[in-house]
Structure formats: structure tokens, C-alpha cells
Amino acid sequence: MSGMIIRTPTRTKTKSFNGKQMDFTFPSPVRGSVDEHSLDNHRIVNETLSLKPQEDIEVSSQMLSDYTSSASNANTYSGNSSNGYYSFANISDNTTASPKLHNHNNMVSPILENTESSFQLQTVESLDPQRQRIRSTYEYGHMGSNQNLRQTREKSKTAESISTTIAQQTIPTADNISFDFSDISGYEDAVSNKSENKNHKPQNSVVKNQLRATSRAAISTNDSPSLSNVYMSSLINSSLESTRKTSTASSSVRSSRSSLKRSNAVRCKGGLLQYFTKLGIKIRKNCNKLRLVMRRKLFRFKKNSKSFSRSNSIRSGLEISKLPKVRHEKKLRQESSSIAPHTLHQKRTHGFNNKLHKSMSLKSLQPALVSETVPEINNNLHDILESKEKTADVPAATKTMKTTPSLRRTPSSIRRAASILTSNVATPKASANNRNSMIEYDTVENSRISSRNSSIKSKGRLVRSSGSVGLSSIARQPSIVVKNKVIPLSMSRFSIKEEIKEEEEESEESTSDYYVETEPVEAAPRTLAGPKSYAPENFRYGANVDDIKTLYKHYLSTVISRRIKMRLEMAQGEHSATNEPALTHQSTASLKDPIASVLTEYDSEGSEGTNLFDDEDDSSASEEDDEVVLPPLKGHNSTMSFVVQSPFTRQNSMASSSALLYLPVKRSLTLPIGMKIT
């Protein structure tokens, strides 16, 4: 039971060297006793790593269960342990080599074979080129003489000396990374190549025969490879590699072969398609250049053929005169290219619109561009010629062009414009520009706009400019932005006739039972504009129009308020009658009395309002030369008051009139039912 526990190596989670694990040795097998050297940990690791999995399944399953055998253990994935458990064989770094080297057949660790009387060591060769050269030169010189002596010495070595040589040679270190089994089969080719490269003489055939004989004798005497045989094979392989290198270097200098397999087609970045597209573009460009050159040559030939009739002297004089002009043009081009702005800031200052959409509202800038003073016409021909000569003598640099700066549409400029709009100070230039920038339709519109501008000057606000697509015309006036749309707030200053028409339509719709005639209101301007000698046109449209509007508004407000009052009182009476059906005949009569009184009052007041314009018509017909005196408006009709009552006291509204709120209010067509107008 204890033997079974000892034979299975324990697993630990240690990933580094830990104490006594270095001295671990496997127990001897059941077949026979083995020396301590054969049970060494490092030797067993190298031996098991060199074997294939199918050769010794027991050893590989015992040693490589957690390390490299991917076929036997499902936890491993690429030759290294994935679960973190290490066997005692994988303690130090000296026992492990890179997994890439174990994939090759020729790079295998050495094997120490145990026999009854002696140990025959199959040594290895390092891949270090310096050691290969030293050993190759040494062994090649003393190959024939010292071969038997080395065999006897190696046989007479003890197990301790063998163990020391194993520890020095077989364990991989930083200098000795990997090992190589050499084969004697390539011996003949190596010697033949080396003899041909050294001396190109017929004596090399003798050397070939001697080497063949010695190699055959060595192979026949020793079935297993001895130390000298392995050294010979390594020597032959090293010489073979050197001869190959020299032959390739001498025959032809070839580039290193790439691992990629490519066809013999055109090797270019992106394949044949990109190659031919680039080729087509180049050919097209060259064809265009050739065509331009041919056209220039042909047109020049035509021009020169026209001037063949001239003499050579004139032609030479023309060519001489052309030379300084061409030079001057080249200088100007160079100067312009050097002065041209490069950075965005320079382009912006020099007038290049780069990444900024600059729109000019030309209609708003027209009064600024046009000079206010009218130039006087000079009829003297002599003065005109002198002025032309003076302007021609002035160089181009001194002439200054008056250009208006472009308006940049940036958030900061829009904010600045909005802050200017809030200020109440108006400059006389702005008012003059605004006055000039108004659109002229006809004489009547001009008079209205001039009166409007005079009223706006006192307030100090900017006037709405002429219509343009740019934002500048809207940003100069008070406006508001709603969902990325600029809505101007100065629309109330302009007369909108639709409002008056809507009010008339609403008033006509509301008069279902009662009809009020509005023809006298339309006849009022005719009476004012009857005599031509009475007042000019400006007085007619400037002064009396406002009075007529106020009179018309006053009339409508009184009519609408009385209608609303009457309807509310009738609704309250009907509501109380429906809620109290058990009323007596006296109570119903008492309710009908105030309604009848309201109707009579309304008729009398309506007749007074209609008679107002009838009296004016009679007076205007009888006295046309006298001034029309408008009746003064009553103060209590200009503003109205209403009383707000709670909806719970609607039934007892006739008895108690306790007002919750009492405020003066202007006319409104949408009054709620709970309000009582007084």
C-alpha cells in the first residue's frame, strides 16, 4: 500500500522551486534494481520527452499526465499544463525546453541506455555554431588515430563520471538550449561536397573512398552509435551545412526565401486590379497632357502662319517687346503666391470665406453703397479729359476700393446683435439707413411708412429691413427663436388688415337675432374726404384715419358688451326656471320683468348708437364747409369691469351679489360663463 503511494508522484500547486523536491528520486522498477543515476529525476524527464507517446505508454502517462501529453490528458491544450498543477519532474527551468523544439524529429534529448555491464552514451550536439566549429576541426584532425582510444576510455568510465558528464552535457541551459540527433546517412554526401569545394582536383576521389571505408567499418562494428560515431556524424552534418552555404554564395546571390507562396503574376499592393487601375489613370493623364500640347502647337502654328506675310524685322521686334511682359507676369504670379494667405486666420482676414457661410444682404446694403450726394454734370469737354488723364496717372496701388465688410454668421455675432437690440439709444445713421431701406410700393404706402418711421424714432428701436434671405435682416430687429425658426416681434408695428376683417366676420356671425348696420361707418371717410379744398392727402390719411379707427372700435366694444350682458342674464333666468319648475305664476312674471327691461334698454341704446352716425350724415349734408365735430367718448365705456362669482352661488345670484374679484378688463369675445359683467 505504501509502495503504491510512493510510485505515484504527488501534485503540488507550487509554480517555483520549493525545497526538498530537488532530491526526489523514483523507486526502482519491479524487474530489477537500478543504480541511483538511472533513477535521477532529470534523466527520466529527458528520456520521456525524447520518446514518442506510442513507444512507452506507461512512462508517458505517469510523467506527462499534467505536462505535455495532450492525447492522454484532456486538461492540456498546447503542450503546456493549463490547470496549474506541476509534477516533481517539472521543478527547475533546466528540465524544460520550448515546445517548438520538441515538434521536430531531429531535435530530441539524449537517451542513456542501461545494460548489464556498461553504459553506452548517445551524446548530443549543441546548435551553437562556435562549438560545432571547434569540435569539427578537432575531431576531423584526430579522427583516424584516436578513435579506438576514445572507445576504450568511454567504456572504462564509471557511473559517477558518466553522471557528471550527463549533468554537464544533457541538461539544457541558457547556452545549450536544444539537442540534435545526427544521422550517419548523410556522411558520404558531406565528404564529397567538402572535397569538391576545397580542391577541384582528381585526388578527392581517393579521400572519398577512404572516408566511405571508415564509415562502413564503424557502422558494422558498432550496432548502437558510440560517442565517436556520434561526433563523426555531427562533424559531417556541420561540414555539409558549410559546403551548402559556400556553394549557394559562390553560385548565385539569392534573396532569403519567403514562407508565402505567391504566383509569378505582377506583385503589387492590392493585386492586379489596383495595378491596372493605376496604370489606366497614368495613361489617361499622359493622353490629356499630350492632347493639350498638340492643341497648343497647332494653334500657335495657325497664329504664326497668319503673320508670315510680315517682314522679319517686325517679327523680331514683336518678340523682343513680348519678353519683358512675360517676365513681369511671372514676377506678379510669384508675388501673389507668396502673399496669398495660408492659415485659416489669414484667409478670414483677407476675405476668403473658408468654412463660414457669409451671406450679404444686398438689399439692406444698397443705401450704404449708393452715395447720398448727387454728382453734378460737367458739360465742359476739356475738364472731363483732364480728369481722365489725372486718374490714369495715379498708380494702381494708391487707388482704394471702398468695400463693405461681410457679415459673419457666428453665435457670438448673433448674441451681440441681440444685445444691441435691447438698447434704447438709436444713432441718426441707423435711422437714415432704415428710412432709405424701406420698400416703396406706391404713394399711399410711402406716406404710411414715413409716419411709422417717425413714431419708431422716438422709441429708439431698429426698423425691419427690406426682405432678404439672409439672417441679418431678421437679426437686426427684435425677434425670438422657436425650434430653430426666427420669428420677428416687430410685426405689430405694421398694419395688418386681416385682424379687422376677422373682427367684422365674428361680429356678423354672432348677430343671429339682432342686426347692426355698419354702412354709416364706411360712409364716414367719404364725408371727410368730400371737398378737395378742405385738406391735403396727407392730412386725410394721416390724422383722421386714427380717429375713425378709435370710433369704430368704441362702437364695436359697446355693441358686443351689451350683447354678452343680455345673453348671460337670459341664460341665468332660463337656468333658474329649469331648476325650480314648481314656481308660481307670480315668480315667473317677476323673472320676466327684468328680461323685458333689459331688452327695452338695449333697443334704446342701440337706437342711440345708430342715430349717432345718422346725425353725422345729416350735418355733413347740410354743412359741408364746416368742420365735423366728433362727440367725446364717455369715460365709463372705454374700460369695463366684471365681477367673478363662485359657481356654487349661481342659483342665488339674483338675491346676493357677493363679488369675489372686481377688476377692470378690456373687451374679449371669449368670456367664461361664471363672470358677470357690470
From Swiss-Prot:
Acidic residues compositional bias, start-end: 613-628
Compartments (UniProt record): Bud neck
Biased composition annotated in UniProt, kind: Polar residues: 9-19
GO cellular component: a single term: nuclear inner membrane
GO biological process, one term: maintenance of protein location
Superkingdom of the organism of origin: Eukaryota
Region feature Disordered, mapped onto this chain: 1-35, 138-167, 190-210, 242-261, 602-632
Low complexity: bias regions: 245-261
Chief location bin: other
Similarity section: Belongs to the AIM44 family.
Protein name, as recorded: Altered inheritance of mitochondria protein 44
